[in-house]
């Protein structure tokens, strides 16, 4: 009954429910989990979104298309998609992950979305998988516009400082917590002529640096 409700939310009925069950299974819960599906789904998602952007923005150059795609397939965006389906309610997690609130964690939710995309592909083929991606992303694709906002925070901050002939920011990892497979990074960002030290957090060093750069952008009012 639970999977029936989820399939209605997804807008897709599986011929082989085993694919969906595996897509919902985190590595903490079973050896037959969604990691391989996530790997496959990531490729399908990138292709589907890339094709949609290529068709929607015929005048966009390669860099602009890449930045827009990155914004749509990043962890935070996938987590938004996951919450639309309330995926956390359907996932199978180990006791430790459940206790620590893994069903709310963006990294776990985003991986699950990618795994479900792969599950649809294995169940019904590439056309059906791409159709579901386009449906789930329809509003996000409609809202997508060319422009500065598609550049990641580090790039925007760097270009802002370079345009004013100021030194580039310095990033430093100040803390790492958690096991090797589930780490949280804390990074500081320092900008010359700004007294404040900005702190960012993320599941990788790169994500933490992006988060720190975003804090700088907000304070400096960079558009």
Swiss-Prot record:
The residue ranges of the RNase III domain are 3-125
Active site annotated at which positions? Answer: 42, 114
Q: Which domain of life is it from?
A: Bacteria
**Gene Ontology MF term list:** double-stranded RNA binding; metal ion binding; ribonuclease III activity; rRNA binding
Which PROSITE patterns does its entry note?
Answer: DS_RBD, RNASE_3_1, RNASE_3_2
Using the record's annotation, list all stretches that form the DRBM domain. Answer: 152-222
The record ties this protein, via InterPro entries, to: dsRBD_dom, RNase_III, RNase_III_dom, RNase_III_sf
Q: What is its EC number?
A: 3.1.26.3
What are the binding positions for Mg(2+) in this chain?
Answer: 38, 111, 114
UniProt xrefs under Pfam families:
dsrm, Ribonucleas_3_3
The reaction(s) catalysed by this protein are: Endonucleolytic cleavage to 5'-phosphomonoester
Keywords on this record?
Cytoplasm, Endonuclease, Hydrolase, Magnesium, Metal-binding, mRNA processing, Nuclease, RNA-binding, rRNA processing, rRNA-binding, tRNA processing
Which cofactor(s) does the record list? Mg(2+)
User: One GO CC annotation, please?
Assistant: cytoplasm
Q: Which GO terms describe its biological process?
A: mRNA processing; regulation of gene expression; rRNA processing; tRNA processing
| CDD domains hit by this protein | DSRM_RNAse_III_family, RIBOc
Localization in the cell: Cytoplasm
State what this protein does: Digests double-stranded RNA. Involved in the processing of primary rRNA transcript to yield the immediate precursors to the large and small rRNAs (23S and 16S). Processes some mRNAs, and tRNAs when they are encoded in the rRNA operon. Processes pre-crRNA and tracrRNA of type II CRISPR loci if present in the organism.
Q: How does it assemble?
A: Homodimer.
HAMAP family for the chain: RNase_III
Please give the family membership noted in the entry.
Belongs to the ribonuclease III family.
Show the PANTHER family listed in the entry.
Answer: RIBONUCLEASE 3, RIBONUCLEASE III
Question: Which named protein is this?
Answer: Ribonuclease 3
Q: Which organism is it from?
A: Glaesserella parasuis serovar 5 (strain SH0165) (Haemophilus parasuis)
């Amino acid at each position: 009954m639970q999977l029936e409700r989820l399939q209605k939310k997804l807008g897709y009925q599986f011929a082989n429910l085993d694919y969906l069950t595996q897509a919902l299974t985190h590595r903490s819960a079973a050896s037959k989990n969604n990691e391989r599906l996530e790997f496959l789904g990531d490729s399908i998602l990138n292709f589907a979104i890339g094709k949609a952007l290529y068709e929607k923005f015929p005048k966009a150059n390669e860099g602009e298309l890449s930045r827009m795609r990155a914004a749509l397939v990043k962890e935070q965006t996938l987590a938004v998609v996951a919450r639309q389906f309330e995926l956390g309610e359907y996932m199978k997690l180990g006791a430790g992950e459940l206790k620590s609130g893994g069903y709310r964690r963006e990294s776990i939710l985003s991986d699950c979305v990618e795994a479900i995309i792969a599950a649809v592909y294995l169940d019904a083929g590439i056309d059906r998988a791409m159709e579901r991606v386009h449906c789930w992303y329809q509003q996000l694709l409609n809202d997508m516009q060319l422009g500065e906002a598609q550049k990641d925070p580090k790039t925007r901050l760097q270009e802002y400082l370079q345009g004013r002939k100021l030194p580039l920011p310095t990033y430093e990892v100040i803390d790492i917590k958690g096991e090797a497979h589930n780490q949280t990074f804390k990074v500081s960002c320092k900008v010359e002529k700004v007294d404040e030290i900005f702190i960012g957090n993320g599941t990788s060093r790169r994500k933490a640096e992006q988060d720190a750069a975003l804090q700088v952008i907000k304070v400096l009012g960079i558009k």
